[in-house]
Amino acid sequence: MNGAKLCIQGVEKFFLHAGTRVEILKKTTVLFQQGMSYAIMGASGVGKSTLMHILSGLELPSAGSVLFNGHTISELAADEKFVFLNQSIGLVFQQPYLIRELSVLENVMVPGLLSGQSSAECKDRAQELLVQVDLASKRTSKVSTLSGGQQQRVALARALFNRPQFLLADEPTGSLDFNTGKLIVELLCKFQQEYGMGIIVSTHDMHVASAMNQIYYLEDGYLVLQPA
């Protein structure tokens, strides 16, 4: 299959707690392909968020490597790491982590401005995305005035600004009611088709997982693919 590839290769993650080794991931190897969508399921506290942080390069594994198109993320130069985090992947978390003092439009523009794009270009792209997530009428509102579901849609628009090859979403519906969560899932699927990107979603919700092409279960440190 053509397209970008994100791979965890022999990845382990453990912590020392009171002198005891606590294993989160045990020698895990999985290849994720652009154009496919994946769910990572597991109970709360099993290590899904840790795995997502490792995949995104925000956290280092205890052993093994994370590779993007064959390049080890931890070995990227600072400028290459910035491009990876700001352009190659998009990140959405359970909490939106928006800049509360800024407007909806200004929040969505941030990745473009960080990439050196002009203010006019960023404004046009942000407005286009806000139409797609049905928040164009809120573009001048402070994000602090929005509901949780609306804030998550702003976070999704921001994550998609630079048309990433992969979108990583860590429990994106975890703090939302069913109907709002369903809308977020529909948007994820819509954008996955439109952009042809890979999507990796961590969740404990089967409704979310069932919308993805493949489902993995994280249990006892192992990532196991559910049979089709």
Task: Please tell me what each predicted stretch does.
Residues 19, 74-90:
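ABC ATPase NBD coupling module
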Residues 56:
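Helix-to-loop junction immediately C-terminal to a conserved catalytic motif
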Residues 64-72:
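Conserved ABC transporter NBD signature motif
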Residues 86, 141, 161-162:
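Conserved signature/switch motifs of ABC ATPase nucleotide-binding domains
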Residues 102-111:
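Short coil-to-helix segment of the ABC ATPase nucleotide-binding domain corresponding to the Q-loop/switch region
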Residues 142-146, 150:
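Conserved ABC ATPase signature
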Residues 167-170:
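Catalytic Walker B motif of ABC-type/P-loop ATPase nucleotide-binding domains
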